[in-house]
Amino acid sequence: MKRQKRDMYARAFKRGYLAGVSGKSKDSCPIEQAEVRQEWLNGWREGRTDQWEGMTGVSGIHKLANVTTA
């Protein structure tokens, strides 16, 4: 549990990625700290790119495993 709390940037990236893959707007970012918000947006951009390339559902499972371990 403590390890998750220490790495806020990786968690923000992961949550942003998941929001992007699910098609949510970047305006739905819940983070207010500038550095952490930027990581969320980076994850969101990568997630949106994967969504546009069709990496959702079963075809995106291999990519999702790499994102969620961070």
Swiss-Prot record:
The organism's place on the tree of life at top rank: Bacteria
Chief location category: cytoplasm
GO BP term, pick one: regulation of translation
Tagged with keyword Transit peptide: no
Locations listed in the record: Cytoplasm
Gene name linked to the record: rmf
Protein name from the UniProt record: Ribosome modulation factor
Pfam families membership: RMF
Stated family: Belongs to the ribosome modulation factor family.
Keyword entries, A-Z: Cytoplasm, Translation regulation
Role noted for this protein: During stationary phase, converts 70S ribosomes to an inactive dimeric form (100S ribosomes).
Gene Ontology cellular-component annotations: cytoplasm
Coiled-coil segments: none
Organism (species): Marinobacter adhaerens (strain DSM 23420 / HP15)
